[in-house]
């Protein structure tokens, strides 16, 4: 009986410290995740400053690259949160250009163009399982395909958000005109290059440093 009691008494602190260690590890992982999201959001904000404007309007920047990378590295939620933070940084630093419309329309436009447009780009993470499987099988072709499709999803969903915002904007000034068609064409002129650049850069990063997309790297 004494032997059993000693064994039990010895196992209690062991279990306690193991549980404590596990809790600390989980907290550390959450902290690391939050730090990564903050870094990628800041990088996205900076990359949005780098690019070139199109003659008819709109800018071609590299803002989608960090969102796509964090979505592949950490998943959809991390990508969506990163997109939200990028939009928030643009708004609080005054890097948004609302249309001269009613307050309600401006709020909706800002919400769509500077929050939803970047948040939905985080859905590029839908291709993360396919990428991880290809990585485990050392199939570089399928890895590249997953990256490109992820970039396409991010770009297309952002494009749709800007199209919707454009319909609201142009609809206020062009009554009777085909504002849907105009918004579709206008936003495609800069979003197509945005997709091509994002897909190319992400694919290059994957070739040069595939472990960049591994959360334990």
Roles of regions detected by a PLM:
Residues 4, 13, 20-38, 130, ...:
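Alpha-helical transmembrane segments and their cytosolic interface
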